[in-house]
Amino acid sequence: MKTPGSQSLLGAWKVTESVFGPDGSLLGTVHQQRTLRTQVSTGIILVDQHCEPDRQLQDHAMAAFSGDFQFSLKRQGRQRHYLGPDVHGLGTTFADGFVCGHGVWPRFGYNFSSWSISLSGSAQLTGGCFYRGQSPVAVMIGVGAEVSDDHWPQASTNIFALQSAQGQSTILDLSRDEEQSSEITREVLDTSDWVEYGLGREDVFHLEAHGTDFVLHKNQRAVGMAKVYGPLLYWEAHGHHGDVTRGIEVMGPGELQWFSLRQHVQNGRLESLEGLRFTI
């Protein structure tokens, strides 16, 4: 969503965001122009946004997401503090271009979770969820690019489908503030099963249809739910020893790259963040 995470994102950007309903249906598009500049005296980044929802959203709550917005962003190590007035919250950068964030938009009465992933060149994937209390309002998936002409980035029209790929996993240990990277392979066994293996790990995933959603099994020891929103799969799996993993799997705009972002929780405490980049 709207949580830029690194100094490389300074400048002028255009973002095309697809808006999905809680049921997974595509509702419309928001076009966003974003400018980030550094306040020399403080080092704080000033973020200006202009958002234009399309006509398909005129009867949806996201129609209010129109006009000009501002907030300040303060960098502190790998943390990004969103200081208002329009966005308050926190983002964590890791794995060379991944950002995981959360916060509130008080003007709308929404809280949010967000993520972004830097792509090769001057581009990024971005997304997240808006909530009112605990009720989801919209799921956003976007593509951003530096402003170079009058064209807008093309939103992905892909539908999530598993593919085998090679890649790299980077895990950030939050207690130590240390990252560890290793090669990883994703092997698709069939339309609902895949395995990921690399240095010291092997994780087997199975999706079982459950209405319009899925029950997800991980290593036959954790079970959870998963749902598709266009090119993205959201999932959460719970083990029997206080372990919880929350993840997204998302296709890159060119279909040749896949990305995963995982949050690993133990006994209610967020212990690590994991970013995975796969090349098909």
Pin down the residues of each PLM region.
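Soluble ligand-binding/transfer domains with enclosed cavities or grooves
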Residues: 3, 7-9, 14-280
